[in-house]
C-alpha cells in the first residue's frame, strides 16, 4: 500500500503535548479515549511515551456506534496485555460509572500508602483525559461533571485550552486537546479516521475515502449495504457500485450522470449517522 504523508500537527496540539508533559506529575491516572469503531487507528502512537508509567485505562467511546461483538474482542485484547479497557458511551453515560470505579480500584494501594503516611482524608483522584480530536473528550467531561463546561462540537480540534474540572468529591479532571501524530505511515489508518469523521473532510479526497468505506462494507457488512441502498447484489467493480448507489439515491448531475462526490458524501454521512447500523472498522 502506498505511503500517505499528511502533515497534521496544529500549534495547539504541540502546546497540549508540552503542557500535558509538564502536568503529568500532578496526575494520578490517565483516561485514554479512543473511538470504539477504530480502537487502534484512533490511538496516538506517542501516547505511551507521553503517559510513561502512569496508570491508564483505555475508554472505547462511542461504543453505541460500534459492532458490539468486535468491541468485546478489543476489550479482551487489551485485557490480555494487562490493560484495563472499558466500552463507554459519553453521550448516554453507559460505562461511565464503571470507569470511575475501575480508576478507584487501580489507585487504591497508592491512596492507602498516602493515608499511612499521615494524609488525614483521601483527596480526589486527579485524572487526565487524552485522545485524538473528535473522540468525545469534551462530551465525556460534560457527562462526568453533569453540566456543559467543555465546548463540544463535531469539528476535529474544537477543544483548545486545558482546564481542571471537579467531578464531585472523588475526581478532578484535566481536559487536554487531542494529540495526533504529525503524519500517517499507513494509508488505511487515514481512511479509517476519515470514514468515522475523526479528521476533517478536507484532509483526504472524499471519493477515495468512500471507495475504502464501500469496499470494507462489501467485505464485512454486505447485507446492510444491500439493504440500505436497495441493491440486488454488490458489483465487484467499485465504479459500478458508485453508479448503482447514485442512481438508486438520485445523486445525479446535469444530464442524469451520477455525481460521485454526492455519492461519497451520502455514504459517509450514512456511516456516521448509523444508517448502516453499528460498524467497526478496526479488526483483530
UniProtKB/Swiss-Prot annotation:
MF (Gene Ontology): GTP binding; GTPase activity; RNA binding
Swiss-Prot/TrEMBL keywords: Cytoplasm, GTP-binding, Hydrolase, Nucleotide-binding, Ribosome biogenesis, RNA-binding
Domain of life: Bacteria
Entry GO terms, CC: cytoplasm
Subcellular locations according to the entry: Cytoplasm
Pfam families: MMR_HSR1
GO biological process: ribosome biogenesis; translation
Residues that hold GTP according to the record: 61-64, 134-139, 178
UniProt domain CP-type G: residue ranges: 17-182
Main location: cytoplasm
UniProt key word Metal-binding: no
PROSITE patterns (UniProt xref): G_CP (PS51721)
Family (UniProt): Belongs to the TRAFAC class YlqF/YawG GTPase family. MTG1 subfamily.
Function in brief: Required for a late step of 50S ribosomal subunit assembly. Has GTPase activity. Binds to the 23S rRNA.
Name used for this protein in its record: Ribosome biogenesis GTPase A
Annotated source species: Anoxybacillus flavithermus (strain DSM 21510 / WK1)
Amino acid at each position: 500500500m502506498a505511503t500517505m504523508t499528511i502533515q497534521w500537527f496544529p500549534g495547539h496540539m504541540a502546546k497540549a503535548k508540552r503542557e500535558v508533559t509538564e502536568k503529568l506529575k500532578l496526575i494520578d491516572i490517565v483516561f485514554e479515549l479512543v473511538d470504539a469503531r477504530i480502537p487502534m487507528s484512533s490511538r496516538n502512537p506517542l501516547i505511551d511515551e507521553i503517559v510513561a508509567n502512569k496508570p491508564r485505562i483505555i475508554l472505547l467511546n462511542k461504543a453505541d456506534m460500534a459492532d458490539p461483538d468486535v468491541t468485546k474482542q478489543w476489550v479482551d485484547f487489551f485485557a490480555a496485555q494487562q490493560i484495563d479497557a472499558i466500552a463507554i458511551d459519553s453521550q448516554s453515560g453507559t460505562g461511565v460509572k464503571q470507569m470511575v470505579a475501575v480508576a478507584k480500584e487501580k489507585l487504591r494501594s497508592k491512596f492507602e500508602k498516602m493515608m499511612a503516611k499521615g494524609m488525614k482524608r483521601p483527596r480526589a483522584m486527579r485524572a487526565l483525559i487524552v485522545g485524538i480530536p473528535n473522540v468525545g473528550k469534551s462530551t465525556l467531561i460534560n457527562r462526568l461533571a453533569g453540566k456543559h463546561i467543555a465546548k463540544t462540537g463535531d469539528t476535529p480540534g474544537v477543544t483548545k485550552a486545558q482546564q481542571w474540572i471537579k467531578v464531585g468529591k472523588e475526581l478532578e479532571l484535566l481536559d487536554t486537546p487531542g494529540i495526533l501524530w504529525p503524519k500517517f505511515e499507513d494509508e488505511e489508518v487515514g481512511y479509517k479516521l476519515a470514514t468515522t469523521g475523526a479528521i476533517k473532510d478536507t484532509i483526504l479526497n472524499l471519493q477515495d475515502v468512500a471507495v475504502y468505506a464501500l469496499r470494507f462494507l462489501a467485505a464485512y457488512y454486505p447485507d446492510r449495504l444491500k439493504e440500505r441502498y436497495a441493491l440486488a447484489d454488490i458489483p465487484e467493480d467499485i465504479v459500478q457500485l458508485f453508479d448503482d448507489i447514485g442512481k438508486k439515491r438520485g445523486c445525479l448531475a446535469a444530464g442524469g450522470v451520477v455525481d460521485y462526490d454526492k455519492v461519497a458524501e451520502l455514504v459517509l454521512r450514512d456511516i456516521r449517522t448509523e444508517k448502516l447500523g453499528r460498524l467497526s472498522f478496526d479488526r483483530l
